Amino acid sequence: MEKLKRKIAEQGTVLSDEVLKVDSFLNHQIDPELMLAVGEEFASLFREEGVTKIVTIESSGIAPAVMAGLKLGVPVVFARKRQSLTLTENLLTASVYSFTKKTESTVAVSASHLSKDDKVLIIDDFLANGQAAKGLVSIIEQAGAKVCGIGIVIEKSFQTGREELENLGIRVESLARIASLAGGKVTFLQEVGS
């Protein structure tokens, strides 16, 4: 998705060979027009899958997930990272490791929001090692629902996340695939060798 790649090139900050900061448009401040375009792209990619729900993880996955939900006409459920007074029973949970934060947390979704009849699209802001997405897959499977794909805004293709998810037989679509962050420069996958 060229609009997203331009935004990454113009406003993204490479903090290390493994960390890209995009807080000016995705995971702190949000660019609504860009997120609408992201949602439209995900809707186009997954429209034929018969999606009935979108699942994401708080908080950076919520904006792209909501826009995709709007375009697909389906509800969005987000897995909570923190215990809530209103989210205490009948929970589907999974343990996930955050590559960026270097922490493990338990995420939860109320079982009342997913059913065995749901066809679920997972959407998240980043794909690195795939642990967050695998946690969401586990939650969806606990509900007896079907994962029909995973939509990622920015994929760090130099890490193992895509391979791990595809090895589970899951379709992964990423709107921007980064081959490298070496030398403080973002190199997109199709630029390699050109």
Swiss-Prot record:
HAMAP family per record: XPRTase
PANTHER family: HYPOXANTHINE/GUANINE PHOSPHORIBOSYLTRANSFERASE (PTHR43864), XANTHINE PHOSPHORIBOSYLTRANSFERASE (PTHR43864:SF1)
Pathways per UniProt: Purine metabolism; XMP biosynthesis via salvage pathway; XMP from xanthine: step 1/1
Source species, domain of life: Bacteria
EC number: 2.4.2.22
Subunit structure: Homodimer.
GO cellular component, one term: cytoplasm
Keywords, comma-separated and alphabetical: Cytoplasm, Glycosyltransferase, Purine salvage, Transferase
Homology family: Belongs to the purine/pyrimidine phosphoribosyltransferase family. Xpt subfamily.
Residues that, per the record, bind xanthine: 20, 27, 156
Reaction(s) this enzyme catalyzes, per UniProt: XMP + diphosphate = xanthine + 5-phospho-alpha-D-ribose 1-diphosphate
Descriptive protein name: Xanthine phosphoribosyltransferase
Enzyme class: transferase
Naturally occurring in which organism (per UniProt): Bacillus licheniformis (strain ATCC 14580 / DSM 13 / JCM 2505 / CCUG 7422 / NBRC 12200 / NCIMB 9375 / NCTC 10341 / NRRL NRS-1264 / Gibson 46)
Role of this protein: Converts the preformed base xanthine, a product of nucleic acid breakdown, to xanthosine 5'-monophosphate (XMP), so it can be reused for RNA or DNA synthesis.
Pfam families associated with the record: Pribosyltran (PF00156)
Listed GO MF terms: xanthine phosphoribosyltransferase activity
Chief localization: cytoplasm
